[in-house]
Amino acid sequence: QNFRYIGLIATALPEAKIIHVKRDPAAVCWANYKTFFPSEGLGYCFSIEDTIHYVRLYEDLMEFWGSELSNKIHTLNYEQLTVNQEKETKRLIDYIGLDWHEACLSPQDNKRGVSTASSIQVRQKVYQGSSQKWKKYEPFLNGAFDQFL
């Protein structure tokens, strides 16, 4: 939810480099809706309609900040990352000004602790197909994601 603070971040930390991972909105909605988030401020995830509304607000805000701060925001397309991991990862590493290491292609080997609802996924290799998982539930969504197709 850091996207809500981009204006503050850019003002307080003018040298900050912001990374925006953009993903298929239906996949984002499904991933949020199917995951239990006990934290305050994430109650929208209990309703598919509220989740869709929240994702639309996120997209609108990111479009705004992308036009206002285009030189400070690097957009990384998740689906492109899964198709061409090396190319997209090198672009990201170059943007943030770090040296390239082959280990960047194996984030699943990093043993550092993580605190995320997707803690199991970060221990897997980057793979294709996760953005389509929602489709097997499409018959039960009553057209909720049609606006994304």
Regions found by a protein language model. Give the residues of each.
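Flexible, glycine/threonine-enriched loop-and-boundary segments that flank and lead into catalytic domains
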Residues: Q1-E15, S67
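Conserved nucleotide-binding/hydrolysis micro-motifs of P-loop NTPases
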Residues: N2, R23-V28, L81-V83
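PAPS-dependent sulfotransferases, especially Golgi type II membrane carbohydrate sulfotransferases
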Residues: A12, N32-T75, V83-L149
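Short acidic donor-binding/metal-coordinating loop in glycosyltransferase active sites
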Residues: Y78
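Conserved phosphate-donor/acceptor-positioning beta-strand/loop module used by diverse small-molecule
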Residues: I9-K34
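Alpha-helical elements of the RecA-like P-loop NTPase motor core of helicases
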Residues: R4-G7, W30, K90
